[in-house]
Amino acid sequence: MKGHFIVLEGIDGCGKSTQISHISKWLPQSGLMPKNANLYITREPGGTTLGKSLRDLLLHEHETNVPAPLTELLLYAADRAEHIHSLIQPKLDKGDWVISDRFSGSTLAYQGFGRGLDINLIRRLDAIARQGLVPEITIFLKISVLTSMRRRAKKSADRMEAEGEGFLKKVASGFSRIANEEHWITIEGEQDQALVSDEIKLAITNKLKNYISNN
């Protein structure tokens, strides 16, 4: 049996990292995973050795060496193609489970709605990079731009996070639209962390029980 692929999406500060940590402790004990399956946690960009170099280039390079928007898009597509080829697909083929902090939705939200690049172009490039792979579950942690800025106020910002409120509003609007169009599971990320975690666990349980029973 092939493994399952779960993705968490949302603007910066929505709590993805915290919730992925909670899920990674819960899932192996949940009864959903086969006993012989392993759980792998990864992220985009940066889920592979090559991806780590691309992450530094995309998010942490000096301001005098900033890639053009189209270059940025192509680098994210390259990161995803390598990520799927080297890590995600091999693990799924073995029956293991994978949780990723960001996937295709982030590219649409940040490069499409945030940067203003052509959405159809992004979808075509993403389809090439994904080679047919689609997550069984994508969970969108929805928070306001003000909450995002408040939560990140005392943290050092990467290049994308430092784009400012106007950019973030476009990205947040993009995420909401994509979540609706793609039928993601939307969870209110403004709640207490424990409540968010409980809702995620319930959503995963319901979704995978239905998926497993139909396959």
Curated annotation (Swiss-Prot):
| Keyword Nucleotide-binding belongs to the record | yes
User: What is catalyzed by this enzyme?
Assistant: dTMP + ATP = dTDP + ADP
- ATP-binding is among the record's keywords: yes
Pfam families in alphabetical order: Thymidylate_kin
Question: Which GO BP terms apply?
Answer: dTDP biosynthetic process; dTTP biosynthetic process; dUDP biosynthetic process
List GO molecular-function terms, semicolon-separated. ATP binding; dTMP kinase activity
* Keywords (A to Z) from UniProt: ATP-binding, Kinase, Nucleotide biosynthesis, Nucleotide-binding, Transferase
Give the main EC class. transferase
Binding-site list for ATP: G10, I11, D12, G13, C14, G15, K16, S17
Source organism, top-level taxon: Bacteria
Look up the EC number in the record and give it.
2.7.4.9
Gene3D superfamilies documented for this protein:
P-loop containing nucleotide triphosphate hydrolases
Q: Which GO terms describe its cellular component?
A: cytosol
The entry's family comment says:
Belongs to the thymidylate kinase family.
Report the function annotation for this chain.
Answer: Phosphorylation of dTMP to form dTDP in both de novo and salvage pathways of dTTP synthesis.
Q: What is this protein called?
A: Thymidylate kinase
Q: Which organism is it from?
A: Prochlorococcus marinus (strain MIT 9211)
